[in-house]
Amino acid sequence: MRIALAQTNIIWEDKQANLARVEEFVIAADAEIVLFPEMSLTGFSMHTDVTAEICQPDAEIQSRAQMDSTPDMTNQPTTGWTIEQIKTLADRHHTTIGIGWVKKTEPLCENHYSIVTPDGKIAMDYAKIHPFSYGEEHAHFRGGEKLCTGRLGEFQAGLAICYDLRFPEQFRAMVPEAEIFIVPANWPESRVSHWKALLAARAIENQCYVAGVNCCGDMDGQYYSGDSGLYAPDGSLLVPTKEIRLTDALCKEEKLLVYDIQNDVAKIRKAFPVLQDRKEM
C-alpha cells in the first residue's frame, strides 16, 4: 500500500488557498492514500466564526436512512463545504484523502478528521476526544465521545488527533482491531521531542504502525517543524520510499513523505505476543 504524508505549511484561515495546495500535493504524491494535518485548510485556529462549517447528513447515509422505516442518524458522518470539496478531489485523482476540518455544533464546535474515498464515501469520520486546554481549545471545541476505526487500504485503521496522542488508553481501546493509527496534528516545534517519542511509544505498546502527519512553518505566532513520519510496530522511524518537495514550497520543511508498506501486523503480534499477556488493572 502506498501512503503519503503531506507535511504542509498551512496558510492561516484561508480555505480556498489551502484547498488548491491540497490538490497540488495529491497530484504530486501519486499514492493510494494521502493524509493531511489537523485542521488542514485553516490551521489550529480558535476563530470558529471563520473556520466552522454547517453540516448536513452525508447524502449516501441519508438516502439509506430514508429507505429504513426506523432510521437512526445518531453519530453518522456529516458533510460540509470542506468534505464536499475533498470528495471532488478524491474522485478526480482516484485517491483516498484524509482531511481535518471544523464542524459547527452548539454551543461549542468539533474538531474533525475524515477519510474520503475515491467513490465519494466518508470511510471514517472522527471528532477529537481531547481538546487541548493549554491552548484554550476546550473553550471553543467540545470533546468527541466515540473512538473511530475503519478500513484504510489493506489495514484496519484507528484515528486520533494531535493532543489525543498523550492519552495511551485511547489507543489501547482501539486494539486489537487497529493495525495502523493515523495521527494528524498541529504540533509546535517547542514540544516536538514529545511528538516523536509519543508516536514511537504508541507504535511499540500496541504493536502497530503509527502515521503522524504534522504541519510546518509559521502560523499565528507558532513555529511548526513538521517531523512527520511513519513508525513501525517496533517503534522505529521508517525511511520514506521517496520525499517530494513541491517547487512552490512555502517553507523548507514543506514536503511529501511517501511510503510503501505491507500489513505484517498480525505476523508481528503472533511472533511476539505481548498484547495477549496484558491484564486488566
What do these predicted regions represent?
Residues K15, E23-P118, D125, E189-C208:
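Cys-nucleophile CN-hydrolase/nitrilase-fold catalytic domain and related Cys-dependent amidase chemistry
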Residues M1-L5:
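Extreme N-terminal starter segment of soluble prokaryotic enzymes
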